[in-house]
């Protein structure tokens, strides 16, 4: 976590299990686990890709310190997180100081238990060397090299393992002065036994100074740089640093973030957290939330006394936990299709549709009166034959409120932003909620959509021609409360000019 915190071990009482949350994202109906789907991860042009070269975003949760809340780290809880929350990555936080590994090296056995569970469940796992009060990673560099030599020797051939070698350097420790030299040595230790699994390196000022790392990157091609934030404390300046680092070709991983302030206890700050999550999803940045614990603090995911083995009801989740679960589930079928969200039927199922296309929509922006419409769509082929994406036209209907022109941007596309073309048009019959539409089409480079496949997220941002604020509540295609993907018939899809999905205004 970002700052030192009082660590209070709470006596756990097992709550009575009542109605289980929602419908689990059951893996019994899936053909593959996340690791089976994506395999060996690597870095390509500063972005995380899978073994097919396809960009992937990891989303998950971190344990709290194993010395205090290690009982929550087990196969049953991790299976529940995979199946119900939709995680594709779990972070096991092994503190070094504060009664951690340095004084209690047996904690490494809990790390091994977590890795074995992740291997069995087919999810990625981050082995976190959690420096914090020991602000300079060089203090325990010798122990770090011994530990990671063992881990790399054990798991060098396991594609789901990720090494995080310095959680949060702080206290005046800088990238060039202390962190980079340390990382060079520990990376060499790992690479002597594991040539290619990802390595995450913390940055200065509690893993905020990614700009320094971006300006002097490590030579290892599969290294990522950690940024940590707490939504109640950290804002736009850190998002700007992510943009800067990515512009320099540095691969960024938000390996820890919280809905609270930096103390871990103020909040939760959910609007600020949503702004962050939208941003990270826009940029394709992987993220892990802090933390899986029932500790009495705002950033804890569980309510006091929650079961240590999963099966959590809504009453077992904290406010933060409910929010984080929703965010992970909302993105669970994006960036690689790890687990599908529970489908919902369109408003008028079948009305106006003639083909085998389903369009899902989510509202990316919770402010309907700011300066942009931010929407995301995902298209599925539910038929038995391939669909050529360049034959499809997606229409998002809105009312321009008398403002001419439009400025259009593709913020993210799983098929590649360069394969998305946007323009505006006018419907045959204007209404008080639709006198224009944004047309989203695919270039030939997007390829075809095979039966049962989906495009993944395509995210489009629409500004008025004069950059003034908009009024989305007056737009036909707008869904104010559709913050998770749902089948949405107020956005239409045409295939070679024929309406195959949705209801025109």
Swiss-Prot record:
pH dependence statement: Optimum pH is about 7.0.
Region (Catalytic): 32-334
Keyword Secreted: yes
Primary role: Endoglucanase with some exoglucanase activity.
Low complexity composition-biased segments: 339-355
Catalytic activity: Endohydrolysis of (1->4)-beta-D-glucosidic linkages in cellulose, lichenin and cereal beta-D-glucans
Species of provenance: Pectobacterium carotovorum subsp. carotovorum (Erwinia carotovora subsp. carotovora)
Origin: domain of life: Bacteria
Lineage: Bacteria, Pseudomonadati, Pseudomonadota, Gammaproteobacteria, Enterobacterales
Region (Linker): 335-352
Classification via SMART domains: CBM_3
Active site (UniProt): 168, 256
Protein name in UniProt: Endoglucanase 5
Biological process according to GO: cellulose catabolic process
